[in-house]
Amino acid sequence: ESTARLINRGYELSCYDEAVRRLRNIGVEIITHMIIGLPYETKEDILSTAEYIGKTANGIKLQLMHILKNTKLLEMYEKGEFKALTEKEYIEIVCEIISILPREMVIHRLTGDGNPDELIAPLWSLRKLQVLNGINHRLKELDIIQGIKS
């Protein structure tokens, strides 16, 4: 909840839970977006969020936090209040998330695209194919399949 307030999400977790309940009651499948790399979040926070989504949604879209021009996040970043994830850190976290998500959950996206004209950091995210290949390579290297730890 503290991260939600920091990024001005605009609603509490209970609102998400209620929306999920109502949508399920009418047969709608739930796909939840998850931003990875938010300020002050630890690896444990990230994995806890992924586990929660794994229990509540049918699908997930993973998104790296992009620091864009003219945003409060940029101001915080420039003051050194937090650091953007490295490509290696992102790949490691995504692999761990995949390992704990239920096997039946659809993973709709492993990373997103930042507008190159607006993106300040992390610039490595502009090389999307390289990131996806890095995730695939690391999954094979660690012998991870989706749900292996769920």
Which positions does each model-derived feature cover?
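Bacterial c-di-GMP phosphodiesterase catalytic domain signature
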Residues: S2, K61-L64
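Conserved non-cysteine loop/helix-boundary elements of the Radical SAM core domain that shape
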Residues: E1-G27, I36-T56, E75-K88
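Ser/Thr-centric signal marking residues that sit
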Residues: T32, T49, T71
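Short, well-ordered coil/turn segments that N-cap beta-strands
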Residues: R24-I30, T56-N58, L101-M105
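Histidine- and/or cysteine-centered catalytic micro-motif in compact active-site loops
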Residues: I35-I36, Q63-I67
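Auxiliary Fe-S-binding modules of radical SAM enzymes
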Residues: G59, H66-S150
